[in-house]
Every structure is written in C-alpha cells, then in structure tokens.
A protein has these predicted regions:
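Interdomain "pre-motor" coupling segment immediately N-terminal to P-loop NTPase/helicase cores
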Residues: 1-21
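Structured alpha/beta or helical-core interaction and ligand-binding surfaces enriched in interleaved
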Residues: 24
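Walker A/P-loop NTP-binding motif of AAA+ ATPase domains
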Residues: 27-176
Length: 176
C-alpha cells in the first residue's frame, strides 16, 4: 500500500486489520479517525463553497521512536483503500538552491494527481522552527511546505519524534 522512491526500503506488506486505540495519545479513537477521513471529501466540498478552494485533512503523529506512527498511517491507508506516497528527507532535500522547494511542490503535486495519502516521515527535517534558521534556504523550504500544506486537497500525514522543534505555524495547520 505504499509507493517508495529512490530505492528506499520497502515497508512491510502485512497491515493490521484493527488498531488498538489505547496506544494512541488522543481522545479520538482509530475508528473515528477513519470515519472522519472517509467524510473528508464532503468536508472539502463544503469548504470549497465557503472559501473557493479544496481543503484536505492534515495530521501530525508524534512520539518517541517505535510507537507506531508510520504503522498507524499504513493502517489508515488500508482502511481507506488508498495508497501512501511516502517521502523521506533523502527524497526531498537537495544541495542545490531552490531544488528542495521544487521537490516539496512535486511531492504534493504527485499525491494530488494520483489521489494518494501523502506521508512525510520525520517531518521535523522539513519544517523546523524558522526562528532558529541560520540560512535563507532553511526558511524558504519551510515556507514552501506550509504553502503546499494549505493548498493540498488530500490527506497529509506527517510523523516526528521531535514535535518541540517544529515551526509554530506548521503546528497550527494540522487538524489532528
């Protein structure tokens, strides 16, 4: 259920058919999240009438390593019958000026075009707090990511072990 690029390791093929929501640090159960995501198209349609643009669903899964963030994303994709477009820092970051921003835009465009769940693994690599940026490209890549997030009509999932270093503006953009 996942599409990986650049020779990345394959994710496990077997996906759980149920999920123990007691392991989630949320008041929303796994089944409620699946139901909400299934209704996301009607949410986007209503929002389009108000704002004139589609709005997707943006989720941030955070916690220490090994707590099942990526596994829960895989579970959601299985329950929704959608494939995951998994992007890691090695797929996005470039040493060339402007190419990182272009890669971010391409990831969102591909997920939109193919109607896939877009999963950014270790998202702290993509949008660390701009106040701590030492170089201009650190700010511009975060700006590009934030702009793409707002315009993305699909399901976006970001995972991180380091929520405390994320840019405050990015945290405000997540629904869950």
């Amino acid at each position: 259920n996942s599409l990986l690029i650049n020779g990345a390791n394959k994710m496990r093929c077997n996906v759980a058919t149920s999920y123990d929501s007691s392991v989630l640090n949320t008041s929303i159960g796994a089944e409620s999240i699946v139901k909400m995501l299934k209704n996301a198209k009607s949410f986007a349609k209503k929002n389009r009438m108000v704002s004139g643009m589609d709005t997707g669903v943006r989720m941030l899964f955070y916690g220490v390593s090994g707590t099942g963030k990526t596994e829960f994303a895989r579970y959601l994709s299985e329950m929704l019958g959608k494939k995951i477009l998994l992007k890691r820092v090695s797929d996005i970051m470039s040493k060339w000026v402007g190419e990182t921003e272009g890669n971010i835009a391409k990831a969102f465009a591909e997920a939109t075009e193919r109607d896939m769940i877009l999963l950014f693994d270790e998202a702290d690599s993509f949008f660390a707090d701009r106040n701590n940026a030492e170089r201009s490209w650190e700010r511009t890549s975060v700006n590009e990511f934030l702009t793409q997030m707002e315009e993305f009509p699909g399901i976006l999932i970001c995972t991180t072990n380091l929520k405390h270093i994320l840019d405050k503006a990015s945290l405000r953009r997540f629904h869950i």
